[in-house]
UniProtKB/Swiss-Prot annotation:
Disulfide bonds: 56-68, 57-66, 62-69
Tissue-wise expression: Expressed by the venom duct.
Name recorded for this polypeptide: Conotoxin Lt3.4
Keyword Secreted: yes
Taxon lineage: Eukaryota, Metazoa, Spiralia, Lophotrochozoa, Mollusca
Length: 70
């Protein structure tokens, strides 16, 4: 009887839950699809603004953890 309960629980509860798409995944996918429609100049503008936001260390405090010094 226990085996049948485990089997029913697996197929009636766990298996259907694995088939649902998570809501958290959908906005990211839509955002990626929207980015494919941008022209080259708009994509370059987004990339350059993201690169400018990166912080760099000063030369006095440069060590192996700082990526801009190397």
């Amino acid at each position: 009887m226990l085996k049948m309960g485990v089997l029913l629980f697996t197929f009636l509860v766990l298996f259907p839950l694995a088939m649902f798409q998570l809501d958290a995944d959908q906005p990211v996918e839509r955002y990626a699809e929207n980015k494919q429609d941008l022209n080259r100049d708009e994509r370059m503008k987004i990339m350059l603004s993201a690169l400018r936001q990166r912080q760099c260390c000063d030369w006095e405090w440069c060590d192996e953890l700082c990526s801009c010094c190397w």
